[in-house]
Amino acid sequence: MVGLTPQHYGNAIALMTYLASTALADNKFPDCTSGPLSKLAVCDTSRDVTTRAQSLVDAMSFAEKVNNTQYEAPGVPRLGLPAYNWWSEALHGVAGAPGVHFADSGPFSYATSFAQPILLGASFDDELVKQVATVVGTEGRAFGNAGRAGLDYWTPNINPFRDPRWGRGQETPGEDPLHVSRYVYHLVDGLQGGIGPARPQIAATCKHFAAYDMEDWNGVSRHEFDARVSTQDLAEFYLPSFKSCVRDAQVDAVMCSYNALNGVPTCADPYLLQTLLREHWDWDQPGHWVVSDCGAIDDIYIGHNYTKTGAEAAAVALNAGTDLDCGTVFPKHLGEAAEQGLYTNQTLDRALVRLYSSLVKLGYFDPAEKQPYGSIGWKDVDTPAAEQLAHKAAVEGIVLLKNDQTLPLKAKGTLALIGPYANATKQMQGNYQGPPKYIRTLEWAATQHGYQVQYSPGTAINNSSTAGFAAALAAAKDADVVLYAGGIDNTIESETLDRTTITWPGNQLSLISELSNLHKPLIVIQFGGGQVDDTPLLTNPHVNALLWAGYPSQEGGAAIFDILTGKAAPAGRLPITQYPAAYTAQVPMTEMGLRAGGDNPGRTYRWYDKAVVPFGFGLHYTSFEVSWDRGRLGPYNTAALVNRAPGGSHVDRALFDTFRVQVQNTGTVTSDYVALLFVKTEDAGPEPYPLKTLVGYTRVQQVKPGERRSVEIEVTLGAMARTAANGDLVLYPGKYTLQVDVGERGYPTARVSVHGKEVVLDHFPQPPEGR
């Protein structure tokens, strides 16, 4: 999402900073008791949402309407409508943004900072996602109630992680459409306080709609990039998470993206914003609105050259269904566009009614006693329960990639703590962060666990200096155990910054190699959102253990040491594919196709089979055996499956079956187990067939040694279906193989047969001619 503003445009949009202004926020609640607004229906809580919002819009002059189509809305002083800043952020906790104002100290000077979405996604724990989101939503509401933020937040980022070089992959839960879809459903449920609630806790915003996953690659910028995507890939990969967010979770807001899609900038695309979003996904209820990414409406005429003037850009965006400009094109040019007859007053009113309907639902115009979330305040921010949840979220996501029985550590002693993350603080938060009350460093955690720590960073994230190597090696020689903490950070991957390589920085690899030559127990902690090719570490016999920790945030050091010492057992799974370093030379970032063919080696685990570490991989401190609970599965009939779907619901969400497997802990350590269920076929529907597809998962908590659990994995019709070339979601007859886990473990498979005729579960709206 939201953008660092395109600097070459010269727009007067504030850049986001980590430390927000200490001044009080612009957002103050209006006076609906005695002020001018009290005479309007917007303050009458007995009226319906649309009537209330319409009364406010009707009272505005044309100039006042135009002025309030920007994120930094000035309000209408003569009506008693205060200014309102729509731009608040809360990707993994309330974060710095133009609309969020942290105090210097005391109340509202911090908020709980949870693990970045890429690490939370690695937990494959839907209930945990909802719990985290509930806390983030509660704390967001507390800031909003205090006038230190808005009541809407521009989160989550749900673009699937297509290319390993993408700088913002850390903001997403992973690469698989089903996984991202389930993640966002539970996240929005927690943020907003339910599925489509009449009175949401906050308004969430799903972004970036659509096919946005590139910042700046080889001189191609997101501000002018035209993503060429087939209808099949669009429906199968790029849109399912948005369908889940919009149609199923009923989010209140959506953000259109910087890029164009098949020739049309997304914020100017009625096919995306009207045909798909509002009509096909039935998302035109009161209080649902679309905001542009910041500067994206500028891009319509400056980056994409889709229109010649700012007035034309403003009009095409408004007509397409963009309601709010995170920028200044609307307030600067809608007046001129109106004079040219490029849009109607009704279209302008429609946008404003959508926006103010959202604020009506949020209780912005209600007296305190009628606001269901009005009592939320500072007492509800960073509570002990929230801190415990932040710890749990970090622990559950950590993935063990290699272990030769060195872990868990069995004795206290001297520990050499080396690497650019060895004493990291903010670095462990990733991007879109806010100030937390504390950040548990690795050094702090090691001391808490009784280790004598010898700290020596040795090297930076990415440079050519070896000046610190000698001190690091000296510290390692005197230690019982060596812990190297490194990887990548926001100087290598971030918004506006894609990677050009997916290797470990050379200086870090050199230091790790020299440390391994000491033949001391060597554990490497890999930080960062995107993966790096771990081949040099996986093949080095003197690198004894390797963990991926993503961006674990405020509880990072404590969570990692709980794993290292065995206080907690690792059970996270990689939510993305770890590609070999050579992959970046095989396919350009601008190639949006998923399927292998021609010069495209394929993307994601569904179409690429040469991974260094596959999607879904994760080791444990114990061992598990998995077996099928039923000897015979099915047979199934397409017509019968569809006919038994509940009336009034979307048939793709109906149950195909609930599969049961037996999971037994055959080792000696109590551990969670993530049961991933994949399906593959070689005759159901047309070729080419994906290598396999995730159709369901569940996280089994705390399985004790020797314990056997019966685990249920629900699979929907939509998960078993495939996407046709025209985008239709089709359930095909044929033979399917079910596989638990990532395949390397040799767990048994099961075969099922689906009979009958192919059935279309969802007819995908066809794009306009020529697209």
UniProtKB/Swiss-Prot annotation:
The active site is at residue 293. GO terms for biological process: arabinan catabolic process; xylan catabolic process. It is an enzyme of class 3 (hydrolase). It is found in: Secreted. It catalyses: Hydrolysis of (1->4)-beta-D-xylans, to remove successive D-xylose residues from the non-reducing termini. Keywords: Carbohydrate metabolism, Glycoprotein, Glycosidase, Hydrolase, Polysaccharide degradation, Secreted, Signal, Xylan degradation. It holds the Pfam family Fn3-like. GO terms for cellular component: extracellular region. Gene3D superfamilies: Glycoside hydrolase family 3 C-terminal domain, Glycoside hydrolase, family 3, N-terminal domain, Immunoglobulins. It comes from the Eukaryota. One of its GO terms (molecular function) is alpha-L-arabinofuranosidase activity. Residues 1-25 form the signal peptide. Pathway: Glycan degradation; xylan degradation. The keyword Hydrolase applies. InterPro entries: BXL, Fn3-like, Glyco_hydro_3_C, Glyco_hydro_3_C_sf, Glyco_hydro_3_N, Glyco_hydro_3_N_sf, Glycoside_hydrolase_SF, Ig-like_fold. Glycans are attached at residues 67, 305, 345, 423, 462-463. Its EC number is 3.2.1.37. Xylan 1,4-beta-xylosidase involved in the hydrolysis of xylan, a major structural heterogeneous polysaccharide found in plant biomass representing the second most abundant polysaccharide in the biosphere, after cellulose. Belongs to the glycosyl hydrolase 3 family. This is Probable exo-1,4-beta-xylosidase bxlB. It comes from Aspergillus clavatus (strain ATCC 1007 / CBS 513.65 / DSM 816 / NCTC 3887 / NRRL 1 / QM 1276 / 107). The lineage of its organism: Eukaryota, Fungi, Dikarya, Ascomycota, Pezizomycotina.
